[in-house]
A protein has these predicted regions:
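Histidine-centered divalent-metal-coordination microenvironment in nucleic-acid enzymes
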Residues: 1-13
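Catalytic-core signal marking the mid-to-C-terminal active-site face
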Residues: 11-200
Length: 200
């Protein structure tokens, strides 16, 4: 499937905070740490269709919660470290997401990282599309199904804080209905083509 990568820059006093080396306890480092820490529970919002999860781990879509500078197998990468275009790139979202919810929650996750002074983990400079390179690293994985993503969100203390209860309850309910409808379909591929192809 297609990706809808979210690119974000942080600026303070006219300076791009993603420029140059990113210290683990810097503002930019804490922002990225927050995004990574909350990435599993955000997945139901960035990847809202059952088919979204077929993409993870192939076609340059991430599977693990990790970051690096130029490595496209990571969840977060830093594509540029010099000039005005310095930024972080979140590579998991897809075009089916509601951009207002997805971007808003990614920003909230990053700000939570800053507020709680989260420390950025070390970068992973391996090709995580290769199972032999990923093995033994002990990396947390993104949800592998929409049902798993809903469960991660429902159990999230962070999302309980930042989302209205009525909104989140209705959203999770609709996502689980999607899962049930697909399972009940006689031909799941045809069901997805009819219901989702034009949307994505």
């Amino acid at each position: 499937g297609s990706g809808l990568h979210i690119n974000l820059s942080l600026c303070m006093d006219g300076r791009n905070l993603f420029e140059g080396d990113i210290a683990p306890d810097s503002i930019a480092g804490s922002f990225m740490a927050g995004v990574l820490a909350h990435s599993r529970e955000l997945t139901v919002f960035t990847n809202p269709l059952p088919n979204s999860y077929q993409r993870f781990g192939c076609d340059e879509a991430p599977r693990y919660v990790s970051w690096s500078r130029q490595n496209r197998s990571q969840l977060v990468r830093i594509p540029q470290v010099k000039g005005n275009n310095c930024r972080m790139e979140l590579r998991s979202p897809d075009p089916a997401c509601n951009p207002y919810l997805a971007v808003g929650l990614v920003l909230a996750a990053g700000l939570d990282g800053i507020e709680h002074r989260m420390v950025l983990q070390a970068p992973i400079n391996k090709n995580l599309f290769d199972p032999t390179e990923a093995a033994g690293l002990g990396l947390e994985r993104l949800p592998s199904t929409l049902e798993e993503a809903v469960q991660a969100a429902q159990e999230s203390e962070f999302l309980h804080r930042v989302l209205p209860e009525e909104l989140s309850h209705r959203y999770y309910e609709e996502e689980l209905k999607r899962c049930a409808a697909l399972k009940a379909a006689a031909d799941s591929a045809e069901y997805e083509r009819v219901h989702y192809f034009n949307a994505i």
